[in-house]
Amino acid sequence: MAGKGEGPAIGIDLGTTYSCVGVWQHDRVEIIANDQGNRTTPSYVAFTDSERLIGDAAKNQVAMNPVNTVFDAKRLIGRRFSDASVQSDRQLWPFTIISGTAEKPMIVVEYKGEEKQFAAEEISSMVLIKMREIAEAFLGTTVKNAVVTVPAYFNDSQRQATKDAGVIAGLNVLRIINEPTAAAIAYGLDKKATSVGEKNVLIFDLGGGTFDVSLLTIEEGIFEVKATAGDTHLGGEDFDNRMVNHFVQEFKRKNKQDITGQPRALRRLRTACERAKRTLSSTAQTTIEIDSLYGGADFYSPITRARFEEMNMDLFRKCMEPVEKCLRDAKMDKSTVHEIVLVGGSTRIPKVQQLLQDFFNGKELCKSINPDEAVAYGAAVQAAILSGEGNEKVQDLLLLDVTPLSLGLETAGGVMTTLIQRNTTIPTKKEQVFSTYSDNQPGVLIQVFEGERARTKDNNLLGKFELSGIPPAPRGVPQITVCFDIDANGILNVSAEDKTTGKKNKITITNDKGRLSKEDIEKMVQEAEKYKSEDEEHKKKVEAKNALENYAYNMRNTIRDEKIGEKLPAADKKKVEDSIEEAIQWLDGNQLGEADEFEDKMKELESVCNPIIAKMYQGGAGGEAGGPGASGMDEDEAPPASGGAGPKIEEVD
């Protein structure tokens, strides 16, 4: 990398339900599989009485531990506790959310027997750490730099909070880019060789939790976002919920029992529903089977694709509204759309594809990129460009992103005066001159809002600051220049200057919205380090325990082998057997011991067994296998069998 020596830069798709990571390598993007072999990793973090789990391990144990397994952090990030969406989500989540300082939603869990509170940024940072580790394991080097994606619909505070999550995870976030833009890059590279002239591309991204539609034009490597629309709260989980509710009612009918207050039963049902939904994308019917779902009653129920579609028809239809809005905003007719690109796992649902295709009068949909991986793919390309790693294939791609919402300030009477219209290409800068509203007014309050409504009270206040010390003058005389400046990450700086005195004041739109302060972030970075070392301690402990267990059982099998057993003097054999038995007993009683305890026990056991085994080899084995005895053994291998002729012992795990 151009002189920075920080290893390759990665692209991370930080999703509501699943995340994905990619890297530019050998002139192409590699989507990296995790330790379970999956190319997407659940955005789940679980806390137990002994450890912290992230990804598949967390999702797999969720039925046993629903209250301490956190997911959907992306639905909380950068929001206030009182937001309507946070309040409605709270009803559905098994974990507890409370209001922290400045109305910041905090997630409450029990970890190692203590109550802990986490901000959404911290949970997201844990998922980011996991994604970074997946990349590091694949690349064999440390990774510092990353491009992270967010929905096009994310507002300023949600973007800032996502960037903060990256900082807590110890990443240098090169840039935050919009998911549809990332998908378009993936698609654009895919098609680059063949296309000439301007292409209008509609990205239809229906993921686990959010829904985004974007219209872009791609011309000679320049991507320009023309319009975006969507629903921050529509996705695969909503389709699962419909199915869950349907089966809850059915269970009630059949068994006269209501499982709505039973997190574990609900979780098992939800997992089965998610699986059924995926199956129904490729088959017309499937069956939900759950043994003793609740109160000893088994649950067994068929579901057809038609029934699933009917349950969700209103939601599927709702997916078409943002498509129309996007075309209207871009002032484009649907006949002028060249390509429709599907992104997000939920676009595999045949009905969604059919409705979309019908809307575009039967036009073929582009399915050449894997919908789960497109966003991470594009992010990886962007990371390669920003870190100067990519080859000429990518270096001439240029990304022009847009602001999703109009930005402006409040003028007399609560009117929203817009300086930057939504769908303006960023980075951008806009100045306008304002004045005072009353005679001899000593200062002005600059209040910055985002939104499309005419009155500021209907829009979202981003932040405010005071410009004081204006010399007394009649109203309308002082000249105050206000400048709005948006950088490439979509982060806004607002400044105001009094022309006569040259007095200036400015604000970077950050902390007014429950954003983390620098101290908070530093504290969280330290905590993240602490959790990481705890995780490593735990791993060491488990490895030491397993090594001891393997050694004990292998040794036991070795001396039970007749060919070897008969070569041992009875006293030695008994000595070995007793010490193994003692070690196994000790293990059963000390499953939660510390690593060094297991290591000490191992040394103790080896000091008894190894000399006896070595003596036996020197004495009875004849020839080549003498010498070092079993102490050089790998922890997983059984001691070698008798010297030259005898058969080798199979490893028993």
Swiss-Prot record:
One of its GO terms (molecular function) is ATP-dependent protein folding chaperone. It comes from the Eukaryota. Expressed in cotyledons, leaves, stems, vascular bundles, roots, stigmas and anthers. One of its GO terms (cellular component) is plant-type cell wall. Disruption phenotype: No visible phenotype, under normal growth conditions. The keyword Chaperone applies. It is found in: Cytoplasm; Cytoplasm, Cytosol; Nucleus. Residues 617-653 are annotated as: Disordered. Residues 619-630 have a biased composition (Gly residues). NCBIfam families: PRK00290.1. This is Heat shock 70 kDa protein 2. It comes from Arabidopsis thaliana. The gene is HSP70-2.
